[in-house]
Regions:
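Predominantly the C-terminal beta-signal and adjacent terminal strand-loop region
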Residues: 30-33, 145-201
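Membrane-embedded beta-strand positions of outer-membrane beta-barrel proteins
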Residues: 21-23, 70-74, 114-118, 168-170, ...
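Residues that define the transmembrane beta-barrel architecture of outer-membrane proteins
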Residues: 17, 47-51, 89-97, 110, ...
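Transmembrane beta-strands of outer-membrane beta-barrel pores
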Residues: 25-31, 57-59, 74-80, 118-124, ...
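Short loop/turn motifs that connect adjacent beta-strands in outer-membrane beta-barrel proteins
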Residues: 15-18, 60-68, 104-113, 155-168
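Short glycine/proline- and aromatic-enriched beta-strand/turn motifs that initiate or cap beta-hairpins
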Residues: 15-60, 198
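Outer-membrane beta-barrel translocator domains and adjoining extracellular loop/strand segments
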Residues: 32-39, 82-88, 126-132, 180-185
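Residues on the lipid-exposed face of transmembrane beta-strands in outer-membrane beta-barrel proteins
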Residues: 23, 53-57, 97-103, 116-118, ...
């Protein structure tokens, strides 16, 4: 009997369409957070890459009666720092947990979302891009995490209902010490620009 109840509960949760899964890939940029936001994105001198998988759960739909959805999210990332000979490690892993809000714009039978997330990031080693930022600056595995994104519903674009709520987009992964508030990291940090595929289910 308990297995039947567990199955029914699982099916009910799936039917609620409250989950998200995002696969992203990108590169480090030498641009600051502000520069990336205004579209001034410069390639880093080294080919540092990231591959990440983020899962989310919808906490509130249309929060405050606005077209804004709130998710709690967690992610795992792999950073490839092998392009830098002095890297502390060629393979570095990251875990993140954060709250993210999406502002929804519905027009022309499609949906565009602007997303902003805030949370924490922990890496298995110090990222090479952070070591190169300022070699005299304090470093930390544990830093503040910001996730900014813009995407559109690919399923609606091609008018294929089974792929509705499948988003293609651009995201920024940002780690920093918030000007010294976290572990005395004042000017270090990293920015990675990524493209991604995200599915709500």
């Amino acid at each position: 009997m308990k297995y039947i109840l567990l199955l029914l509960l699982t099916l009910n949760l799936i039917a609620q369409d409250d989950y998200s899964l995002r696969l992203a890939y990108g590169n480090a940029t030498s641009s600051t957070l502000g520069d990336v936001v205004i579209g001034d994105i410069q390639n880093h001198d080294y080919d540092f890459t990231v591959l990440s998988l983020d899962g989310g759960y919808l906490l509130k739909e249309n929060a405050l009666n606005w077209p804004m959805d709130i998710y709690v999210k967690g992610g795992l990332s792999h950073f490839d720092d092998s392009d830098y000979a002095k890297a502390s490690s060629a393979d570095i892993y990251e875990a993140t947990i954060y709250l993210k809000a999406y502002w929804n714009f519905d027009f022309l039978d499609n949906r565009v979302r602007l997303g902003a997330g805030e949370g924490i990031s922990y890496t298995s080693d110090i990222l090479s891009v952070e070591l190169l930022e300022d070699e005299t600056e304090s470093k930390s595995n544990f830093l503040n995490y910001i996730d900014l994104s813009v995407d559109f519903d690919f399923g609606r674009l091609i008018s294929y209902k089974p792929m509705h709520n499948t988003y293609i987009g651009f995201a920024l992964k940002h780690r920093s010490g918030i000007f010294g508030l976290i572990n005395s990291v004042t000017s270090g940090g990293s920015n990675y620009t990524t493209v991604y595929l995200e599915k709500n289910f």
